[in-house]
């Protein structure tokens, strides 16, 4: 059974992937570089995704061993502590190429969880 903590982490990952994709939609890497507000918003989404991934139980991460969990969880440290070296191109490529497989895994986990005690915590 999925714990409430894990369910909340999964919903945070799902919601922030959707936001990052929405914010970066239609932008080239050059446009993202020029739009500091969007760059900061997308980077914050990636930071939340990283932190929420740390809250997932190991057995859940093991079910999705195709995902680079260590890199996902470690990315947040870069966004928080090495923020002056976060490259727009890497953020853009992450949104364009790496979030879809994570979103698919998260949605599978949420779909397999019982619906009766869904602990969604945001409007």
Task: Show which residues each predicted segment covers.
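Solvent-exposed interaction patches of small proteins and small membrane subunits
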Residues: 1-123
């Amino acid at each position: 059974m999925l714990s409430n903590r894990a369910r909340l982490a999964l919903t945070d990952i799902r919601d922030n992937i959707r936001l990052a994709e929405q914010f970066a939609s239609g932008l080239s890497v050059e446009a993202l570089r020029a739009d500091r507000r969007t760059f900061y918003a997308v980077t914050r989404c990636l930071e939340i995704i990283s932190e929420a991934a740390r809250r997932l139980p190991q057995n859940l991460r093991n079910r999705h061993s195709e995902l680079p969990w260590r890199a996902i969880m470690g990315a947040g440290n870069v966004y928080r502590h090495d923020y002056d070296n976060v490259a727009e191109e890497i953020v853009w490529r992450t949104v364009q190429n790496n979030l879809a497989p994570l979103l698919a895994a998260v949605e599978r986990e949420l779909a397999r969880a019982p619906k009766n005690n869904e602990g969604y915590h945001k409007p």
